[in-house]
Each structure stands twice: as structure tokens, then as C-alpha cells.
Amino acid sequence: ESKKRIALFAHWDTRPWADNDPDEKNHKTPILGANDGASGVGALLEIARLVNQQQPELGIDIILLDAEDYGAPQFYTGKHKEEFWCLGSQYWARNPHVQGYNARLVSCSIW
């Protein structure tokens, strides 16, 4: 187990509402996930395959999250609108897979 680590995160969920779609009639329909959550997960699965072949000296933790894009839609008028975003990340931050976990976090977006 390497003490030097990086953590790579991706989420597989998508928005249940296309509330930012230019066409207002789509605002209450779900977003298809192939190029949202699924693309990041696919990229991390390929990284995992390559890491397994190369066996780097650096420890690489791949963490897949859910409920990241569940945030309240634009048309929501209730309280606590921000609390519904990044639920998987919030949970993981409070309950890491290893007590005292410490890694360099790598941020990258796939659009």
C-alpha cells in the first residue's frame, strides 16, 4: 500500500430534470446520462484497466459516487435548495473508506 495517493472521483447519476435546456418543454424531463455521469465512470474504468497493467508506485483510489446531480431544479421554490447537490460527495466526505484517509484530489470534467 503506497502512502503517496491520488483520488479520482466520478458520478454515474444524471439530472432528473433538464431544467437548463433551452427548450422549456424539456425542463421537467430527465437528462440522458451517457454523456453526463456515465462518461466519467467510463473514463475511470479505463484508467483502472491501465493502472492494473502498469502497476505504478503511486496509489490510485477510484471512487464512484451517486446523487451528485440530484440538486433542486430551477423551478423549485422551497427552502434549502443547495442541500440537495453532491449528496454522494457529502456522504463520502463524512464516511471515507479508510479512517484518516489522505490523498491528493484530482479534478477534471468531461463534457
How would you describe each model-predicted region?
Residues 1-30, 53:
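Soluble metallo-hydrolase cores and metallopeptidase-like ectodomains found primarily
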Residues 28-111:
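Acidic/histidine-rich catalytic neighborhood of metal-dependent amide-processing enzymes
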